[in-house]
Curated annotation (Swiss-Prot):
Belongs to the cytochrome b family. PetD subfamily. One of its GO terms (biological process) is photosynthetic electron transport chain. The chain crosses the membrane at residues 36-56, 95-115, 131-151. It comes from Lotus japonicus (Lotus corniculatus var. japonicus). This is Cytochrome b6-f complex subunit 4. Keywords: Chloroplast, Electron transport, Membrane, Photosynthesis, Plastid, Thylakoid, Transmembrane, Transmembrane helix, Transport. Its main location: plastid. It is a multi-pass membrane protein. The keyword Disulfide bond does not apply. PANTHER family: CYTOCHROME B, CYTOCHROME B_B6 C-TERMINAL REGION PROFILE DOMAIN-CONTAINING PROTEIN. NCBIfam families: cytb6_f_IV (TIGR01156).
Length: 160
């Protein structure tokens, strides 16, 4: 076991640090060598052993074998690609679809330059960033849900 050092709350240096919100690691058990040298490797090796044990004792099958001669009627990507898939599916010009996909990260990069984000952490005091986030989330959900529907209903989600 490591040496446990009790805090001296009468120490003016510690009191000054605690008043500033610092100095919480001034006392207690040191992380080196006890935690970093002995406990962390045991935890990491234990986690690896559990994963290997589960993989050996209970292997899960990935799915049914692929049949290259049977193609489904509509191929859908993974769920996190639904909005991008919907953009490519509905825009008639593929170059325009690719430009729309590139404009999303480019637009997100410009948001910090539109307003001074470093000054405030409250989202209500950053209206441009909050508006971009809310509109982007709504559009992404709209496109993601529309990608699961047939092409005729995909833009209106079958509501209109």
């Amino acid at each position: 076991m490591g040496v446990t050092k009790k805090p001296d709350l009468n120490d003016p240096v510690l009191r000054a640090k605690l008043a500033k919100g610092m100095g919480h690691n001034y006392y207690g058990e040191p992380a080196w060598p006890n935690d970093l040298l002995y406990i962390f490797p045991v935890v990491i090796l234990g986690t690896i052993a559990c994963n290997v044990g589960l993989a050996v004792l209970e292997p899960s099958m990935i799915g049914e074998p692929a049949d290259p001669f049977a193609t489904p009627l509509e191929i859908l990507p993974e769920w996190y690609f639904f909005p991008v898939f919907q953009i490519l599916r509905t825009v008639p010009n593929k170059l325009l679809g690719v430009l729309l996909m590139v404009s999303v990260p480019a637009g997100l990069v410009t948001v910090p330059f539109l307003e001074n984000v470093n000054k405030f952490q409250n989202p209500f005091r950053r209206p441009v960033a909050t508006t971009v986030f809310l509109i982007g989330t709504a559009v992404s959900l709209w496109l993601g849900i529309g990608a699961t529907l047939p092409i005729e209903k995909s833009l209106t989600l079958g509501l209109f």
